[in-house]
Amino acid sequence: MSSEKPTSLNAMRATNPCETPIQLLHEFGTKTGNHPVYTLEKAEGQAHNPSFTFRLVIGDITSLGEGPSKKTPKQKAAEFALNILRGDTSKCLPVTDTLRDPKKPPNQMQENPVGSLQELAVQKGWRLPEYTVAQESGPPHKREFTITCRVETFVETGSGTSKQVAKRVAAEKLLTKFKTISTDNIPLNKLIGNKMGCTWDSMRNSSGEKISMLKRSPLSIPNTDYVKMLKDVAEELDFNLTYLDIDELSVNGQYQCLAELSTNPITVCHGTGISCGNAHNDAAHNALQYLKIMCIKK
């Protein structure tokens, strides 16, 4: 009699009929070398009635799941992936209430990514996470917020129907990123270097050519390469400049990005455009306008 463990999904289901879709898919991934990866795509709704969407990737298969807790959409996505692996894409079995944690109400959040990220920062000796509202859009009854979360040199964005939701999504993305890298071996302080010392006072007192030109420039000339102009200012004042593209299009269907300046305090400006390059130029333009205001302001 063979002692070989079953590798087919039907055999695994027959061997362990009480396993949840997540458990079964994890077992299948372990035996085939394709481990499932779950990513939080969206979190919206109010705190008392949240809605989460998770993306699952296992090998070449991608599926989505949605639900009122973080566990339910993962189960749905896993169930759908299992159906694809079985060769039956016509059905996605419903996730029953037995899959939910009986100790928690369905609408109660199972995790606090904002608190978890702060705890991680304290454990590692990093500066606490910094959250910045990058954009507010949409009508008053359907607002959409985009928030950036920065921990040392790492930045992620989150979008949601409230600032709290967007903040949670951004924190969740950073936590996911930290799980894929070895945070113990990252020389974060060395990565930051000495480029965090560009303060508003040092900008106002600077007599450099580029910053002096910025102070007297109208910043309203059509077809100006604001990306190059901001790059020149950054090099002269010795601060880092990073463009972060946002995956989601704006409410008007345009590309979005953020321009992050490692000034002290950090500056983050939003930009939109019909192309990625135009969005960068718009973000650079907004950043230059902000720098100009702060340089003149006493």
Swiss-Prot record:
Pinpoint the DRBM domain residues. Answer: 20-87, 112-180, 225-293
Tell me which Gene Ontology terms the entry assigns under biological process: regulation of regulatory ncRNA processing; siRNA processing
Which InterPro entries does this entry report, sorted A to Z? dsRBD_dom (IPR014720), PRKRA_DSRM_1 (IPR044465), PRKRA_DSRM_2 (IPR044466), PRKRA_DSRM_3 (IPR044467), RLC_Component (IPR051247)
Which Gene3D superfamilies has this protein been placed in?
3.30.160.20
Keywords, A to Z?
Answer: Cytoplasm, Nucleus, Repeat, RNA-binding, RNA-mediated gene silencing
**According to its record, what are the GO cellular component terms?**
cytoplasm; nucleolus; nucleus; perinuclear region of cytoplasm; RISC complex; RISC-loading complex
Tissue occurrence: Expressed in brain, heart, kidney, liver, nerve and spleen.
Its annotated compartments are:
Cytoplasm, Perinuclear region; Nucleus; Nucleus, Nucleolus
Is-annotated flag, keyword Nucleus? yes
One molecular function GO term is: siRNA binding
Q: Which domain of life is it from?
A: Eukaryota
Q: How does it assemble?
A: Homodimer. Interacts with dicer1 and eif2ak2/pkr. Also able to interact with dsRNA. Associates with ribosomes.
Give the family from UniProt. Belongs to the PRKRA family.
Q: What does this protein do?
A: Activates eif2ak2/pkr in the absence of double-stranded RNA (dsRNA), leading to phosphorylation of eif2s1/efi2-alpha and inhibition of translation and induction of apoptosis. Required for siRNA production by dicer1 and for subsequent siRNA-mediated post-transcriptional gene silencing. Does not seem to be required for processing of pre-miRNA to miRNA by dicer1.
Q: What is the name of this protein?
A: Interferon-inducible double-stranded RNA-dependent protein kinase activator A homolog B
Q: What is the lineage of its organism?
A: Eukaryota, Metazoa, Chordata, Craniata, Vertebrata
